[in-house]
Each structure stands twice: as C-alpha cells, then as structure tokens.
A protein has these predicted regions:
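Patatin-like phospholipase
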Residues: 1-148
Length: 148
C-alpha cells in the first residue's frame, strides 16, 4: 500500500498470502511481508488469472465472492454509515476491475454469498458451505475445461 505496486506472493505459507489478500483497507490491518505493507490484492488485481497463465497452468479457476448490493426498502434514500460506504465503494470498484480479468479464467465459481460482506466473520461456516456447494456444482465445467 505504500508504493501502489502489485506484489504476487508465490512462496511461503498459503495462510500468509490469504491473510494479506483479505486485508481490506479500513476494515482489517495490513500485513507486513518483508519490507512491504500489503493490503487486499483486489485493490489492483482481484482475479490474478494472468499470473496463473504466466506460470503455465492448465486450468485457471476464479472464485467470485462479491456480495450482491441489494439495499432494503428502508435503506433506500438513507445515507449509509461511513464503514458501509467504504465497503460498498470497494465492492463497486472491485467489480469494475475484476470484470475483464475474470475472462482470463477457464471456469468461474460463484458461491451464493447473497448480501454477506467480508467483515461478517461470524457467518464463515455458512459461507464455507455455500462455497463447497458451488465448487461441487462447478465440477462438470471443470471436467469439460480439462477435457476429462
């Protein structure tokens, strides 16, 4: 975040890369990686399929976990809180940045996250199950892409 450079993490422990990738600015604390301070990779590259292509992978699978912005009737016409405004802003920008990058993936898995936001950590078990269901449903598309 200090330089604006994209920093692919392709070595070390997966949990460290995942922790950095979930460091949404203003919501979660950035991660120090060497001399760099890292935030959510979605800021610059929310669908790093281009890196997978450069590594020569046979199949690039993207997972779209962006929540659907559906304000309730009572929310319409009301100014949202500052945190909600920030999160929605990141989601909107993320969608615009992700759209062309998603086309580089062979298969896109989209779990039904509904209106759950990343900061709602208490809903993790529900989201994990939705991810599992979406992954199972994507097996035919994955097999087709692999020509299996």
């Amino acid at each position: 975040i200090l330089t604006g450079d994209e920093v692919p993490i392709d070595d070390g422990y997966a949990y460290e890369a995942m922790r950095a990738s979930s460091s949404i600015p203003g919501v979660f604390q950035p991660v120090v990686h060497g001399k760099r301070v890292l935030v959510d990779g979605g800021i610059l590259n929310p669908v790093p399929a281009n890196y997978l292509r450069a590594l020569g992978v046979d199949l690039a699978i993207a997972v779209d976990v962006m929540p659907v912005l559906r304000p309730s009737e009572e929310q319409l016409g009301r100014v949202p809180s500052i945190p909600s405004t920030l999160i929605n802003s990141f989601d909107i920008m993320g969608r615009l940045v992700a759209a062309p990058l998603t086309r580089l993936a062979d298969v896109v898995i989209k779990p039904d996250v509904g209106e759950v936001f990343g900061a709602e950590l208490w809903r993790a078990p529900e989201l994990i199950e939705k991810g599992r269901e979406a992954a199972k449903a994507a097996i035919p598309a994955i097999c087709k892409a692999l020509k299996v």
